[in-house]
Regions:
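Long, structured stretches of catalytic cores involved in phosphate-ester chemistry, encompassing
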Residues: 1-172
Length: 172
């Protein structure tokens, strides 16, 4: 894929902060990290039904080396990751070496979501529970990051799709 190991997602100062934060549990029972976007390519279709992207560089799934450092640091803190900016509500369990060996993320969409995105992998997910939709389960995103789709609020492709009710606006 397009990994550039020397490219930075988080700087050294940010990674040092996360390392110290992970070790300090003073007056804390739970930790959550807030950021602009999730650490994977969380959508395949952009803008309209035919707008498939292989990999979205507007996500924190790239560079993969930096992504793995970031979620590795958050994993040490047992932190839940809460983010936005993917225009699509999702819950992912991220993986570094194996599927589901790192953090969970919850991405919320905009309240008035005018730019549609869908999670619609070409291959069915692996290791799904019986009866689960084929879009769920273990996948590789466009950057070959290991992600497990737990929940996705794809917009409904129906007539009158310009209405906010069909855009999964505010679903999360």
């Amino acid at each position: 894929s397009v990994d550039v190991p020397q490219a930075r997602l988080l700087g050294e100062r940010q990674l040092k902060f996360l390392d110290a934060w992970a070790q300090d549990w003073t007056d804390a029972d739970l930790k959550a990290a807030l950021s602009q976007t999730i650490f994977c390519g969380g959508a395949h279709i952009h803008g309209s039904i035919g707008g498939r992207l292989h990999a979205d560089l507007d996500s924190n799934g790239w560079p993969q080396t930096g992504r793995n450092k970031a979620i590795g640091a958050l994993r040490k803190a047992f932190a839940f990751h809460y983010a936005g900016d993917q225009h699509l509500a999702t819950v992912f369990h991220h993986g570094i070496d194996e599927w589901r060996d790192s953090i969970y993320s919850f991405c919320v969409p905009s309240i008035a979501n005018l730019y549609l995105r869908w999670w619609k992998p070409l291959e069915p997910g692996k290791n799904r529970k019986p009866g689960q939709d084929s879009i769920l389960g273990d996948h590789l995103d466009g950057f070959n990051n290991k992600v497990t789709a737990i929940a996705v609020a794809n917009p409904t492709p129906e007539k009158g799709g310009d209405k906010l009710t069909t855009r999964a606006a505010g679903f999360g």
